[in-house]
Amino acid sequence: MQTDNFNHNTTEVDGLKWHWVEQGEGPAIVLLHGIPESWRCWQHQIPTLAKQFRVIAPDMKGYGQSGKPKGDYAASTVAAETLAFLDAIGVEQFHIAGHDWGVVIADNIINLAPSRVERYIRCCLSLHTYDARNSLHHQWNGRNPEKACQLMANADAYVRVWYESSCKPESRTDEAEIEEIIKEFSYAGISDVVPLYFAHIRNSIPVDYSKFTMPVLYIHGEHDPRQPIEYARGMEEHIPGLEAVLVLDAGHFVTWERPAEVTNAMMWFLHSMLASGLPLFDRSRHHGLPTKPVHDVESWGVNPGIARPKAG
C-alpha cells in the first residue's frame, strides 16, 4: 500500500505489467528514470509540472513495481514497449524527459515515433553515438552480467555507492531519500534483469538524430563525474534544436541534488511553447552551450527552501 501523496496506477500491456504515477491534467509529459532508480527520480518535479501538465512517471521495465520478465532489453525494444504502454493509457502526443538511462530509452522512442514527441528534455547523458568514453561502466556491466547481478542484488550497498560517487558531496540527497531509492531498487527480480539493459545495448536499432527536429533541452550537472561536461562538447551539432542549462553545484543526480533548479528549467522550457516565445537561456562560451535560466526559481511556485545557493 502506497503512503505518499501521489496517484499510483498499474496496468498490463501485451503481458508486461506497468506501474506508474500520474498527476495533473493538460498536455502529457512522460518522465523516464535511469539506474538505479524508479519513478521517484522525478518526485520533486511532479507536483509543479502537474499544475499545467498530465504527468506520467512510470517504473521502467525491470524496475520498481513494474514487470521484470527475462528476455529482450534492447533499448529499441523497451522503447517500443513504452510506446505501447502510452497507447494503452490514451497518450498520443507528449513531451518527454529522461534522466541517465531514461535518456537512452527516450532517444529510442523518438527514433521510432518522432512525430509523437512535442518537446524533449534530456538530463545528464551525452550522445553515445560519437563518444565511447560515455559508456565505460555500461560496457563493463554488459560484459560481466553475472557480476553485475551480484552487485545489484545488494541494493543498499549498490545505491549508496552510486549516489556517494555521483553526487557532489555537499549536495547529496538526505538519508530518508536514499532509503526511498533503496526500497524501490529492492523489489525481487530487479538485479536479475536490469543488467540485461547493458548486455543488450548493441542489439538496439541505431538512433538517427536527424529525426530530433523538436525543441530539445539538455540539463547537465556542473560536477557530474559520470558524464563530465566536456562529453557534451559538440552535442548541438548533432541535435540542431538544442538548448541547454548547466546546473551549478550538482553532480549526476540533478533531480535530487538541485530539485528546484531542475524544475524551474523544465517549466520554463515547456512554458515557452505555451506562451512567451522568448529566448530560453542566456548564451555562454562553455562548449557553446547556454547555462543560465532567465526566470527565478519562485516563478513556478517551487518552494525556494529547497533551492541551495549557487556558487560564485
Residue ranges and their predicted role:
Residues 242-312:
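Catalytic active-site module of serine/aspartate enzymes centered on a nucleophile-bearing elbow/loop
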Residues 7-13:
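Short acidic-hydrophobic surface loop/beta-edge motif
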Residues 2-6, 18, 28, 63-65, ...:
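Flexible "cap/lid" subdomain of the alpha/beta-hydrolase fold that forms the substrate-access gate
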Residues 16-65, 226:
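Conserved HGGG/HGGXW glycine-rich cap/lid loop of the alpha/beta-hydrolase fold
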Residues 40, 44, 230, 257-260:
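Generic recognition of short, well-ordered alpha-helical segments
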